């Protein structure tokens, strides 16, 4: 837990975490690592339709059979510990907004990611749009508790898919000067957003610093699809950061037990974290192992369940043993409206992430309906709660350089 946190904040986190802290469970953590090593060695990870990834893993000692590569977990840990930074600086257009991510730093909070639907302040329900997206970015900028404006806060359903990465980039750069997350629609989109963001930040590349953090998901069980693999490679080679995550549904895409989910998720993220270091030693990474019980009767995850919080505490400790920053989830819920269920479930998940020492907390505001909806009302309430941990107001963003804005608009028009 960072020493910079206020005394009362540390006391609250200690109170929440006291019953769960796994630091003393050395035998349990070693058992998870050994079991994940066995999964990697005997079952392997499936890397779909990406010969480059399979070739580089074979050169690193992996044994490939078709698109399945069996790996040495201990060697993957050595690669990660040797090269991956324990802390890095995520830069914004405004240097005053730069945020450290990792060891000793307070958690970074970012809003919901990927919601197709929106509930407006008046209760009306709409599909996401370009206009609404800009309003959500502006709300994230104005919220002192949110130190990152995220990515794909809602889906721009009124914009063609090939234009969305640049439209979202323009919204993040013009409506805020905080750091934000990168785009993974395709390797080409990721690289375009990286290059244009670097031009907007207008500071030379520096060791231990980057401009964007990208969400790279494994697909449980034990699979990586081609687009995340190719994006991971492009991002690492550019020196930008990746948040390599396994997001499991316990009993559906992972074992139903906490221990089983941790073993599978750890095996999946070890492969992705090591790949980033193989492509570019020192590439910034964040590790995420997240698992939620899956209700087979309703065919829906149960967000807020205590089992997921136990997964978070052990995942955080596994990340610290690797020496990398750790991801947590924010105020996520299965509730359909912003009610007592929403507050109770979201509060439990967010508290577990904070108390576990998570470095980057995604979905920190706005989440409803298993993530299918972003609510303006809940967005504001979650952000207001987070603001109590920091400063009360945010100044307006610095103006975006006109040449950068013109270049982005020109590319959008060509698309």
Where would I find each of the regions flagged by the language model?
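Short beta-alpha connecting loops at secondary-structure transitions
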Residues: 17-21, 298-303, 331-338, 366-378
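Glycine-rich, N-terminal phosphate-binding loop and its surrounding beta-alpha-beta segment
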Residues: 51, 55-120
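Catalytic-core signal marking the mid-to-C-terminal active-site face
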Residues: 2-11, 22-35, 43-58, 377-415
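N-terminal basic/disordered segments at the start of proteins
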Residues: 1-28, 88-113
């Amino acid at each position: 837990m960072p020493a910079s946190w206020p005394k009362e904040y540390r006391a609250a986190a200690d109170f929440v975490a006291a019953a769960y802290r796994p630091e003393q469970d050395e035998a349990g953590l070693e058992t998870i690592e050994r079991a994940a090593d066995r999964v990697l060695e005997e079952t392997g990870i499936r890397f779909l339709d990406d010969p480059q990834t399979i070739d580089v893993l074979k050169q690193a000692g992996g044994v490939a059979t078709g698109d399945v590569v069996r790996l040495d977990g201990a060697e993957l840990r050595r690669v990660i510990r040797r090269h991956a930074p324990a802390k890095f600086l995520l830069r914004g257009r405004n240097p005053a907004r730069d945020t450290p991510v990792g060891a000793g730093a307070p958690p970074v909070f970012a809003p919901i990611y990927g919601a197709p639907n929106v509930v407006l302040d008046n209760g009306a329900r709409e599909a996401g749009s370009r206009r609404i997206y800009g309003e959500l970015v502006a709300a994230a900028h104005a919220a002192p508790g949110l130190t990152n404006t995220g990515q794909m806060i809602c889906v721009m359903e009124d914009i063609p898919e090939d234009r969305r990465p640049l439209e979202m980039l323009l919204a993040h750069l013009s409506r805020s000067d905080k750091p934000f997350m990168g785009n993974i629609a395709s390797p080409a989109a990721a690289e375009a957003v990286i290059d244009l963001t670097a031009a907007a930040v207008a500071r030379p590349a520096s060791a231990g610093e980057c401009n964007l953090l990208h969400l790279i998901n494994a697909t449980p069980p034990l699979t990586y699809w081609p687009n995340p693999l190719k994006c991971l490679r492009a991002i690492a080679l550019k020196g930008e950061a990746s948040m390599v995550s396994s997001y499991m549904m316990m009993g559906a895409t992972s074992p139903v037990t906490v221990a089983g989910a941790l073993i599978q998720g750890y095996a999946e993220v070890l492969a992705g974290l090591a790949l980033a270091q193989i492509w570019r030693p020192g590439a910034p990474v964040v590790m995420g192992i997240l698992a939620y019980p899956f209700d087979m009767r309703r065919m829906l995850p149960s967000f807020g369940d205590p089992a997921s919080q136990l997964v978070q505490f052990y995942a955080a400790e596994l990340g610290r043993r690797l020496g990398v920053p750790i991801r947590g989830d924010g105020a996520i819920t299965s509730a359909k409206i912003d009610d007592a269920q929403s507050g109770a479930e979201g509060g439990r998940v967010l508290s577990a992430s904070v108390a576990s020492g998570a470095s980057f907390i995604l979905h920190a505001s706005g989440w409803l309906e298993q993530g299918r909806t972003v609510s303006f009302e809940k967005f504001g309430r979650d952000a207001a709660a987070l603001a109590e941990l920091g400063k009360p107001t945010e100044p307006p963003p610095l103006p975006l350089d006109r040449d950068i804005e013109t270049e982005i608009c020109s590319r959008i028009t060509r698309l």
